[in-house]
């Protein structure tokens, strides 16, 4: 007996027009801001962008230009956009490298290690995930200042190398691995680290891809934390750098829009690269759950 929730053979869709219109409206609501952002980034006049905002003219450009994208690289010596972009890439790569390693190691130990109080630790992690990050910003900032790590890459990377959410996601995947696979590796003389590195990680690519996407987007979009821990352009990421286009006397809408498009592009590329694994992981988790 089929368990497919879609339309079964012999049945017809009773409301095809309603479904089509609903999907079209939802898609339009989602895509419209992105389209508006791209169109505004192609307009040469920042005053035109502000004047047309809120009207249908905002979704059309008569004389498109890529000059805005060139201008953000040479906007001002006080706003080195190219440096901000490089900083964001460095922070992203360091965070992904450490986050994927430490979160997966912790998940493996919780799933297969002989750890006393494992249930209590899992409960504590879920509780910590519920706590808003904003509530621990000031204590964490104080720790970074006392360690002398503020205004650098370390302060923007180290706090995100461990996350209750990602440990729990990977724990769920690791705990579903058949016991026979683990026992076979033990019989072959593999150490716990070798089992983790050579057996579990290769078969966990869908789950790791999911964590990489979520962690990458979270890191790339960080604003409050880097705003608090950075004082110089040397380590400031692109999310904070864009705020420099909004001055007290004037707002460079054209440059801000172009910079926002540049900031948005890597997130889309990251998802497209890992899209297959991400979808497979979600489906697999749903079936196992």
Labelled PLM ranges:
Residues 1-5:
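Short, intrinsically disordered terminal tails adjacent to the first/last structured region
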Residues 7-11, 15-289:
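A structural signal for multi-pass alpha-helical bundles of membrane permease subunits
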């Amino acid at each position: 007996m089929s368990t497919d929730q879609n339309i079964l053979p012999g049945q017809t869709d009773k409301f095809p027009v309603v479904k089509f219109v609903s999907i079209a409206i939802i898609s339009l609501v989602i895509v419209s801001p992105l389209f508006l952002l791209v169109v505004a980034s192609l307009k040469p006049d920042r005053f035109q962008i502000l004047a047309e905002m809120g009207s249908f003219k905002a979704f059309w450009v008569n004389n498109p230009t890529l000059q805005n994208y060139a201008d953000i690289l040479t906007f001002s010596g006080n706003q080195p956009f190219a440096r901000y972009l490089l900083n964001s890439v460095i922070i992203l790569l360091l965070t992904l490298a450490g986050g994927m390693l430490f979160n997966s190691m912790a998940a493996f130990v919780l799933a297969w290690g002989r750890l006393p109080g494992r249930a209590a630790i899992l409960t504590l992690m879920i509780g910590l995930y519920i706590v808003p990050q904003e509530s621990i910003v000031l204590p964490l900032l104080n720790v970074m200042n006392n360690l002398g790590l503020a205004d650098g890459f370390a302060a923007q990377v180290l706090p995100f190398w461990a996350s209750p959410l990602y440990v729990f996601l990977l724990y769920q995947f690791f705990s579903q691995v058949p016991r026979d696979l683990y026992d076979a590796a033990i019989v072959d003389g593999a150490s716990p680290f070798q089992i983790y590195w050579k057996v579990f990680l290769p078969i966990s690519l869908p789950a790791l891809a999911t964590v990489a996407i979520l962690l990458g987007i979270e890191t790339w979009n960080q604003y409050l934390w880097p705003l608090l821990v950075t004082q110089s352009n040397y380590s400031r990421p692109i999310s904070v750098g864009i705020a420099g286009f909004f001055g007290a006397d004037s707002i460079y809408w054209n440059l801000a829009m172009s910079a926002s498009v540049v900031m948005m592009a890597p997130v889309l590329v990251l998802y497209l690269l890992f899209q297959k694994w991400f979808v497979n992981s979600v489906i697999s988790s749903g079936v196992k759950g």
